[in-house]
């Protein structure tokens, strides 16, 4: 009897203070929603970073640099690294060390909605081969010595919408999109890849 009266009293009290009750419930729901969003974002970042790296690949950057974009290594330094003992070799016994160049460019979004930052990776067939998650899904590889790029699948969607055959303007020249690649949802899918020497000439 007392339990029934207490429960009835609680219900009446909640109804009498329905505004406070509603705000409390909404506040708790908002906290749960934000917490769930943070967890989902953290998991997404973890999967992206895990897919981008590899246990048997080492990235060498300049002392004090935190990212590839902010690093600078000379050709001579890269050559010295390539002859260090203990590096993986191919079937001919040549070092599998690969020198790459990385630049950050601005590309216009569709509909005139400003620009987006995009990473351009100057690499080679050997560099692509060191990342087994990268697979060409349409078009072809860029030709060494040509102003050609292949584009990550992530850049073909959304507001950039880069498509096979498009002409991109950066580095004081035009570049033709000759291929589209996937990379198992890793960070590489948000990059453009081109011939390293051509990228270095365009941004020297």
Q: Residue locations for each model-derived region?
A:
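Glycine- and charge-enriched low-complexity intrinsically disordered segments
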Residues: 199-204
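Hydrophobic alpha-helical segments typical of transmembrane helices
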Residues: 10, 45, 77, 195-198
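Alpha-helical membrane and juxtamembrane elements of multi-pass inner-membrane transport
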Residues: 4-8, 23, 39, 43, ...
């Amino acid at each position: 009897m007392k339990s029934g009266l207490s429960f009835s009293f609680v219900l009446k009290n909640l109804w009498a203070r329905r505004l406070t009750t509603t705000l409390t419930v909404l506040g708790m729901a908002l906290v749960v929603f934000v917490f769930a969003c943070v967890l989902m974002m953290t998991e997404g970042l973890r999967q992206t970073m895990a897919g981008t790296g590899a246990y048997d690949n080492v990235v060498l950057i300049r002392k004090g640099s935190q990212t590839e974009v902010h690093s600078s290594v000379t050709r001579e330094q890269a050559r010295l690294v390539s002859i260090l003992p203990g590096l993986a070799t191919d079937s001919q016994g040549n070092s599998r060390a690969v020198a790459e160049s990385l630049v950050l460019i601005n590309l216009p979004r569709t509909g005139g909605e400003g620009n987006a930052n995009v990473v351009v990776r100057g690499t080679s067939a050997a560099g692509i081969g060191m990342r087994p998650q990268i697979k060409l899904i349409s078009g072809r590889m860029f030709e060494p010595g040509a102003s050609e790029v292949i584009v990550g699948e992530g850049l073909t969607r959304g507001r950039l919408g880069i498509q096979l055959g498009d002409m991109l303007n950066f580095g004081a020249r035009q570049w033709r999109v000759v291929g589209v690649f996937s990379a198992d949802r890793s960070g590489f899918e948000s990059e453009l890849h081109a011939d390293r020497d051509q990228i270095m000439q365009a941004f020297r």
